[in-house]
């Protein structure tokens, strides 16, 4: 009997694979159907965001953050705004805080619907994306009614938010909440007890709590492994400390637990949105939405027609920008994908000296090899989907 040399073979997954979630290229080493090694090749969407921010004023830097995790844009702007406000020592009025929190939670739902439904599609369920995207469309319209843009909003700015919300919009967001919970029930009815869906997700991509912390996981990836770590609760920012919500936690750390947590988080987000809507249409119905510091926040149009000082301030703020006192600061928010952090170094000028962006997806993607080793080729898409990766923030 002749001897044969058996060797592993290598295949490319992506960068134009339908379930590669953007421009990801994975080099997979396979032993038959079993994955031996996963080598992510990133950088295909690198745009030099951090360097570009150094050449722009603090206000002009805001739109770059929309283009990182472009599924939930306002959450990124929020982190940058918090960092700059810390350096400036600004206080945001309560109405402005509530609007920020409301739209952060809308962003969370936008992201989770996208992830849960497309991950279901990757493992063979075709109906959830159709239902989920109908709801995403309604949320995109809320974005558009707040700031004029469906995606790249540039709405959350250092000092507050760009404009106040009209009362009809706040009411419509309130009316959207309960019917959406019914849609979530319908999606859960399709997936949660579905035999095929469970076979594709239960005990796939298991990560223990120690490993999750060692790899630098945050967000759903840590909560799926059993830690109730959520920055909205553990390091509260804005008015989250005044709001009531629960933090769903898994116990197995597999793809299925992460799916269940995302579903439950959407319900918690609706709970937060309802509280914000109640306050915005009740106790905080009227009030400023931005800081009253005229050296940072531009004046209203009406003021500019009456006051020469307002006109001068407006001109200076939009040409030169405001100067931020020298110092360094790290601000993080609980973005839908995990802890999104911004480390800003200011040198006293009108532009950031350095702006380091800590994207949660970057830490999650580096663990692909660890998570997929020993699984079958078909499980790679299930694991990748449950990591919730968007390439805008990974490549920056």
Swiss-Prot record:
GO terms for cellular component: plasma membrane. It is a peripheral membrane protein. Keywords: Cell inner membrane, Cell membrane, Membrane, NAD, Quinone, Translocase, Transport, Ubiquinone. Its EC number is 7.1.1.-. GO terms for molecular function: NAD binding; NADH:ubiquinone reductase (non-electrogenic) activity; quinone binding. Belongs to the complex I 49 kDa subunit family. This is NADH-quinone oxidoreductase subunit D. It comes from Agrobacterium fabrum (strain C58 / ATCC 33970) (Agrobacterium tumefaciens (strain C58)).
